[in-house]
Amino acid sequence: MRTLAQAITEAIQQVLNSPQEFVPLHEPRFSGNESKYVQECIDSTFVSSVGEFVDRFENKLADYTGAKYAVAVVNGTAALHMALLLAGVDSGDEVLVPALSFVATANAVRYCGAKPHFVDSEERTLGMDPEALRAYLHVSTEQRNGLCVNIKTGNTILAMIPVHIFVHPCDLIGL
């Protein structure tokens, strides 16, 4: 009988043209003025967290999403870290994360001083398994004063981070 890990590995290999070769997870696409814009950033000396291009990006993102504001950060780890801090995750809390994910997911939790708890992934979406999540919550947690609490540790489970894997959306409705 094959394990879930073997099934997921086989599923990933089936969608790859050459499963033995390097698979770029985030391949950049350059189709326009990127070189020109990078040179403009270098010439302006604003190449990191401030400058005209950052302001333009934040404004366009806010317009596109309908949000009042948007804040650009250096990478996905920083974005997850900021989201967890804004959700109130702190030292002593616990956060549910999928077993199959980029390390940034668990790192962002640890940066808050919290502990990640890994929930099994499902073969169909490769994301967090809603059934495994329900089983974990039923057996390992209880509600106290409106909060989800880990029975074994007494710590509050304050957040869950669903992750879409290899362009496969996780089952957000099931979660």
Language model features by range: what are they?
Residues M1-L86, D90, P162:
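Conserved PLP-binding active-site segment in aminotransferase class I/II-type PLP enzymes
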Residues L85, V89-L175:
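PLP-dependent aminotransferase-like
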